Amino acid sequence: MTVPTTIRLPSKQTVILEGDDLRLRIDDNAPLPVLRPDEVLVRTMAVAINPCDYKMHERFPSPGAVDGCDFSGVILAIGAGVPSLGVSFQIGDRVCGAVHGSNPIRHDSGSFAEYIASEAEFTLKIPDSMSFEEAAALGGTGLATLGMALFRTLELPGTPEEPAQKPLTVLVHGGSSSVGTMAMQLLRLVGHIPITTCSPRNFALAKEYGAEEIFDYHEPDCGQKIKAYTRNTLRYVLDPFTDAKSIALCCGAMGRAGGRYACLEMYPDYLVEKRTLRVGFVMGPALLGHRLELDYGYERAADPEMRQFGIRWYRSIQWLLSKGQLKPHPLRVLPGRFDAILQGIEMLKSKSVSGEKLVVSIGM
C-alpha cells in the first residue's frame, strides 16, 4: 500500500452501520476499512442516498455492516496491486464511484463512512468542472445497474464510443427519477431513443435529460397511449419499480411481438410466464463479479465474465466524463453530515422526494 508520509490516518472513524437491533445508527468508533491490493483508500467528501440504502439492510440484516453505496472523495492511499491493473491513480486524485453497502460478506465496505476502500477498476476520476456533491449524485450504483440493464438484459447495440447506427425506441418508466434521467442520457449517447413516463410536474425535467416523448403515468390508459405512439412495435422496457402498477403499464405498452424487459426489483413469477417477454432482474453490485451472499433470488455466484464487462463499462463511463457528456440528477444537499444521511433515508422511505437526488457533504 502506498501512503504519503505527510498523511497520518486515524485508527477510528465515524460510520453509519446496522446495529444489533437491526436499525441503522451512527458509530463514532468504527475501524477504517482494510485496504486490499486492488483498492484505493478514499477520504469521503460527499455521499448520495439511494433506496437500496434502506432496502438492503432491511431485506438482508447483518449487524455491524456499514451502509451506503454512492460516494465521492479524495484518494489517500493506493493498494500495492493497483499499478498492474491498467488504471492510473495518484494520491490526491478526486474520485467517485459506488461500493456494496450493507454487505454481509464484508462489513466495512459501505460508503456512509469517513473513509472508503474502493476497487480501483470501479473508481472514476472526477472532472475538474464537477463538484464533489455532483460527482456523488452521478450515482455509481445507477451507472453499474444501467450498464447491465441496457447492454446485458435488453442487449441493446452500440457503445458510447461507437453508437448504434439504427436507433431503437426504449421505454424508461419513471423518467424523472435519478436512474431514469441517467438511463435517458446513456440511451441518447449510445444512439437510441428514450421515451418515458412521469408526473406532469416533471415533464420539463424528463425532456431536459433526453426524453423524446413523455406520458403521464397517472392516466389509466397510459400504456395504451404508449402502444399507439410506438405503433404497437415497442420491444424494450426498463422498469425500475417492478410493482403491480408498473408491470401492468409497461406490459400494456409493449408491442404485439413482445420483447425484452429489464427489472430493477425482483419480478413476480407471472411476468416470466408471458412467452413473448424475455425478463431480466438487475442488481448493481453484481457488476463487480463477486459472489453475492444474499437470499430470496438476490444471490449471485461469482461471475468473472460479468466483471470484465463491468471494467469495460467503467472505462466507457470515464471516457464520457472526460468529455463532459454526463450530468447528475438535480441535487438537494442536506446539511448535517451523518445525521442528515439518516434523515435522508427516512425521506426516501416515506416517498417525500421527487425530481431530486439527496446528497450529503461529509468532508470537513
UniProtKB/Swiss-Prot annotation:
Single GO MF descriptor? nucleotide binding
**Domain of life of the source:** Eukaryota
Query: Pfam families per the record?
Result: ADH_N, ADH_zinc_N
Q: What is its EC number?
A: 1.-.-.-
Q: In which pathway does it act?
A: Mycotoxin biosynthesis
Q: Which UniProt keywords apply?
A: NADP, Nucleotide-binding, Oxidoreductase
The record's section on InterPro entries has: ADH-like_C (IPR013149), ADH-like_N (IPR013154), GroES-like_sf (IPR011032), NAD(P)-bd_dom_sf (IPR036291), PKS_ER (IPR020843), Trans-enoyl_RdTase-like (IPR047122)
Q: What does this protein do?
A: Trans-enoyl reductase; part of the gene cluster that mediates the biosynthesis of a family of the mycotoxins cytochalasins E and K. The hybrid PKS-NRPS synthetase ccsA and the enoyl reductase ccsC are responsible for fusion of phenylalanine with an octaketide backbone and subsequent release of the stable tetramic acid precursor. The polyketide synthase module (PKS) of the PKS-NRPS ccsA is responsible for the synthesis of the octaketide backbone. The downstream nonribosomal peptide synthetase (NRPS) amidates the carboxyl end of the octaketide with a phenylalanine.
Name of the protein described by the UniProt record: Trans-enoyl reductase ccsC
**Lineage, opening ranks:** Eukaryota, Fungi, Dikarya, Ascomycota, Pezizomycotina
